[in-house]
Amino acid sequence: MDDYEKSKVLTKRYKKLKKLLKMVYGYDNFRPRQYEIINKVINGEDVCAILMTSAGKSLCFQIPALYLDKPAIIISPLISLMEDQRLILEKLGISSCCYNSNVENKAQMRKDIMQFKYKFIYVSPESVVHLKDLIVKLEDFQGISLIAIDEAHCISAYGFDFRTAYREITFFKEILPNVPILALTATATNIVAKDICKVLQLKTNEPIKASFDRPNLYLEVRTKSKNPANDIVPIINKYPNQSVIIYCLTKKETQKIADILTVHKVVCGIYHAGLSNEHKTKTHTNFINNKIKIVVATIAFGMGINKPDVRVVIHYGAPKNIEGYYQEIGRAGRDGEKSYCYAFYNFQDFMIQRRFISQNNNPNYQKTQLALLEQMKKYVTLRTCRRKILLEYFDEETKEKCDFCDNCCGVHKNIVNENVTSKQNVQSEAKLIIELIESIPNRNFGVNMYINILRGSKNKAISPAIRKNKYYGLGSKHSSEWWKEVFDNLIKQGFLQSVSLKTGKFPIQVVKVTNKGVTWVSMADLGSLLDNIDNSVKLDPVEMVASV
């Protein structure tokens, strides 16, 4: 019981709400900060609440609506999430509806809403703009207990999952000035939280935050091997008959991993945005009902999963930001039992993520997302406590060691030179890369091809003419992973750029030298002037992980 709740235990309202909590939900006690949020909403106050996954966000808007006996409107981004909530409420004997693109007879549902048939009205952000008049009438005729905006981080341009549709729902204060707004999220930094308050015009700019710590989650990071089966199958075998989610970066990778698991006689479902709604619904339902234990998915299988006994979450590929990663591992251990989160990465993953980011033409978006990606890179490469890195990212103070992550438990203590970061001067190698690319005109090669050339690979894709290139084999003393890091840093610093070219059915990613890169090499050739060149084209020492 937190201090706020302790100060209210003798009030009549507190006793009524505790009785409601027990009668409807079967719980004896509120979770941290729950009562404070509920009480403020009942008082008509706006609230921005940041509660970790499994902290009971739904009760924060359900209990006020039941207590006030007025309908609540909930903005939710996923149809699957709405349906999950509707089914849960149905089991509790509480009426609710989901107004979204799947509804065939919207006119009838609007009529039912105005006849007060539903206590909870779930609406997608895309659909709510068409319900303005109905919402105003509902407030005039019966009153609305609150407007709840779930996954509120989607409204902030500073957040990891900004969605344009959420920007269209900022009208509530104009049409319902006296109805409290409850903005809810499990993943928001202080900057994002304040932006949520500003955009929604809340009468508060200070969020109510509970701890982000999920002490029952074990955190471990590993580098990918050349064979995904060697990485994933042993983990699945370590936790037999347990519910497992495996996240992949792309739809193609999702299918590939699912096929590999099938070959190894591992039964799994697959879920990504390219599949039919029928297929996705079946996978989702079968997983929730334990008909399948393992799902391989993209992040499309994220917010809509309300399964308490997920025991393992595997990220096969570096996530693009810490907020998304935190939300996805939050699918694990919602029952409070110990659960295990593994992340596999290589530096090609970061190049893939940069490519995704570059496909958005908004420079502010690119800048924000690239900064978030760098934070994720630090998480997977640093040797300090993983939990400490996560919690400090969310502006939460914590102890130096959690004793429940790979770094604290000494998992890597016998591994030489893996994931040890150091600042390295790679000017000569950077110059080698740029000169190699410039020496092969009219060629559209990706990072891996240039690395193969530098390392003197015997790959058949390297033509005899290129094998005669003076740079062929000059980088053989360094590993492919090491070279990938150098390429990644050169792209990050603007000396190279990754360009998408459509040469056939599918686009390919090729590497080009930028004007900044050409200028830098020209100056680097002057040798003695290298340390005195203009800072705008200076190559900084880079933080490297791979040592050879």
From Swiss-Prot:
Q: Which residues form the Helicase C-terminal domain?
A: 231-376
Which transformation does this protein catalyse, written as a reaction? Answer: ATP + H2O = ADP + phosphate + H(+)
Q: Which NCBIfam families match?
A: recQ_fam
Give GO MF terms, alphabetically: 3'-5' DNA helicase activity; ATP binding; ATP hydrolysis activity; four-way junction helicase activity; nucleic acid binding; RNA helicase activity
Helicase ATP-binding domain span: 38-206
Motif DEAH box, residue range(s) on this chain: 150-153
What protein family does this chain belong to? Answer: Belongs to the DEAD box helicase family. DEAH subfamily.
* Keyword Transferase in record: no
Q: Which residues form a coiled coil?
A: none
Q: Please name the GO terms of the biological process aspect recorded for this protein, alphabetically.
A: DNA replication; double-strand break repair via homologous recombination
* Name of a matching Pfam family: DEAD
Stored PANTHER family: BIFUNCTIONAL 3'-5' EXONUCLEASE_ATP-DEPENDENT HELICASE WRN, DNA HELICASE RECQ FAMILY MEMBER
Q: Could you tell me which Gene3D superfamilies the record lists for this protein?
A: P-loop containing nucleotide triphosphate hydrolases (3.40.50.300), Winged helix-like DNA-binding domain superfamily/Winged helix DNA-binding domain (1.10.10.10)
The protein's matches in SMART domains, at most eight in alphabetical order, are given as:
DEXDc, HELICc, RQC
| Binding-site positions, ATP | L51, M52, T53, S54, A55, G56, K57, S58
Record's protein name: Putative ATP-dependent RNA helicase R290
The EC code for this enzyme is 3.6.4.13
Q: Which domain of life is it from?
A: Viruses
Keyword vocabulary terms for this entry: ATP-binding, Helicase, Hydrolase, Nucleotide-binding
